[in-house]
Amino acid sequence: VKIGKALGTEVTVLSTSEQKRKDAERLGAFDFALTSQPETFIRLQRRFDFILDTVSAPHNYNDYVNLLKTDGTMILVGVPDKPTLLEPFPLILHRRRIAGSVIGGIRETQEMLDFCAIHHIESDIEVIPIQQVNEAYERVIKGDVRFRFVIDLGSLR
């Protein structure tokens, strides 16, 4: 959200959880929509030039492809553990693209870090002492994590 806003785009956060709305607003999102509500996919049809899909849980890619404008692109960075079916007709008819990315190389990562430094973009993290690593792991399993955990190695003493 922060990078998209710094690039001058209108970022919409799509989420299954209403609990993420406040974070989306705080981060500067232009809009927020619940994907757990079927009307969202009707209201947002053909609205986006670009979708960055970070979801690792199985979900219907076709619903999201239909949110793309003609010539829109969806980049997949989440890796669901099950295959998914994809309808080719909406891709072909509207010249939409789907691509994937694991991570950038050293050059791309440095460009991103430089961009973030120029625009004063910082990561949202939760710092935990090493003694709480097991609790943090349990929270990850339960889906009770808002941001990345960072272990304070100073707590090893």
Which residue ranges define each predicted feature?
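Adenosine-nucleotide cofactor-binding segment
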Residues: 5-63
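C-terminal hydrophobic helical "lid"/dimerization subdomain
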Residues: 6, 62, 106-157
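Residues in the short beta-alpha loop(s) of Rossmann-like NAD(P)-binding domains
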Residues: 17, 80, 104
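Well-formed, non-transmembrane alpha-helical positions, independent of function
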Residues: 23, 63-66, 90-91, 115, ...
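Short glycine-rich anion-binding loops that position phosphate/pyrophosphate groups of nucleotides
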Residues: 57-58, 80-81, 156
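Rossmann-fold dehydrogenase core element
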Residues: 73-75, 86-126
